[in-house]
Amino acid sequence: MGSSSFLVLMVSLALVTLVVVEGVKGGIEKAGVCPADNVRCFKSNPPQCHTDQDCLGERKCCYLHCGFKCVIPVKKLEEGGNKDEDVSGPHPEPGWEAKSPGSSSTGCPQI
């Protein structure tokens, strides 16, 4: 095998390797966004997934509580929605308001 054939073979192998690695890392991203993670970790846990394709159903591969794992995503904000709105936590039912003992219907303490 001549040196030019060897060079063509090596370049071809390198290109195939890059394409395969990109395909494994990438994949199709599932709908939704990963939940917010406010946990501070001293050490990361081993990953349970690497891409969304590793997760069953609608679950996404997200970094949560010190490691990558398959979790149910939160829904994306609607077009034109408030970008500062927190979509990661539970939200009360419409009409619900916090009241403490001794407070008025406005939620302010009675004097």
Swiss-Prot record:
Its main location: secreted. It is found in: Secreted. SUPFAM superfamilies: Elafin-like (SSF57256). This is WAP four-disulfide core domain protein 12. GO terms for cellular component: extracellular region. The gene is WFDC12. Residues 101-111 have a biased composition (Polar residues). SMART domains: WAP. Residues 27-74 form the WAP domain. Residues 80-111 are annotated as: Disordered. GO terms for biological process: defense response to bacterium. One of its GO terms (molecular function) is serine-type endopeptidase inhibitor activity. It comes from Colobus guereza (Mantled guereza). Antibacterial protein. Putative acid-stable proteinase inhibitor. Keywords: Antibiotic, Antimicrobial, Disulfide bond, Protease inhibitor, Secreted, Serine protease inhibitor, Signal. Disulfide bonds join C34-C62, C41-C66, C49-C61, C55-C70. Residues 1-23 form the signal peptide. It comes from the Eukaryota. InterPro entries: Elafin-like_sf, WAP_dom. Pfam families: WAP.
